A protein has these predicted regions:
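A structural "domain/chain start" motif
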Residues: 26-88, 192-200
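Structured loop/turn residues at beta-strand edges in well-structured enzyme cores
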Residues: 21, 45, 111
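Mid-chain, structured segments of secreted extracytoplasmic proteins
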Residues: 79-105
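Surface-exposed short loop/turn segments
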Residues: 27-35, 101-154, 165
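Sec-dependent bacterial lipoprotein signal peptides
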Residues: 1-26
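Short secondary-structure boundary motifs at beta->alpha junctions and helix caps
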Residues: 68-77, 147-199
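Generic short beta-strand segments
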Residues: 55-60, 120-126, 160-162
């Protein structure tokens, strides 16, 4: 037995599939990595060895947020912002190392680590453009739980950065707004750490 499908149904189905595809949009990769770092003055560094926690699982976390024209952008916030976190700490402390876990008190003490920063990162993006996909606005926020070498919480620090970029500025640099946000976040994080009496 054979069944025939009316052409109108085929056309309607094709139109629906196309509309769904257009609504879903595309996902474009960008990077948040910035080469800009806060100034590091040896004379004003706090003579402590500190660590930040960054696991392989953190580095592999991919995030997708809105772009323009119905599209979205993807990136790896922990991997991309690791340099920013390290640069912020290096602007304050004499020695900075990375740890795979925050819970190894004996290893921390043996390494001479005084403070351990465990970051949690949130991001968001948007675009005012209906004709191009790169985000024109980007927000990045990092909140760090700071513990001593034994794992006891000392305090928490938070920093955020906002970045904007217009269509005419991109010139192939599609993550420009994200990198501007990362630059501001790095500067604010180092300032917040330096401001805290508990972290000196």
């Amino acid at each position: 037995m054979q069944f025939s499908i009316p052409m109108t149904a085929i056309r309607h189905g094709t139109a629906l599939a196309l509309a769904t595809l257009l609504l879903a949009g595309c996902v474009h990769p960008i990077t948040m990595i910035t080469e800009t770092a806060p100034p590091r003055s040896q004379a004003h560094l706090i003579p402590k060895k500190v660590a930040y926690v960054m696991t392989d699982a953190d580095r592999d976390k991919e995030v997708v947020t809105p772009g323009g024209s119905g599209d979205r952008v993807s990136y790896f916030p922990y991997r991309d912002l690791e340099k920013s976190i390290r640069d912020a700490l290096r602007a304050v402390y004499r020695d900075v190392v990375v740890l795979r876990t925050a819970g190894d008190a004996k290893a921390n003490e043996a390494a001479g680590v005084s403070l351990v920063f465990t970051p949690r990162i949130t991001t968001d993006s948007s675009s005012s453009s209906w004709i191009s996909w790169p985000p024109t606005s980007f927000t990045a926020e990092v909140s760090c739980v700071v513990t001593d070498a034994a794992g006891a919480e000392i305090t928490r620090v938070r920093a955020a950065g906002n970045g904007t970029a217009e269509f005419g500025e991109f010139k192939g640099d599609f993550g420009l707004a994200a990198r501007r946000a990362a630059t501001r976040l790095t500067s604010q994080l180092s300032s917040e750490i330096r401001r805290s009496e508990k972290l000196r």
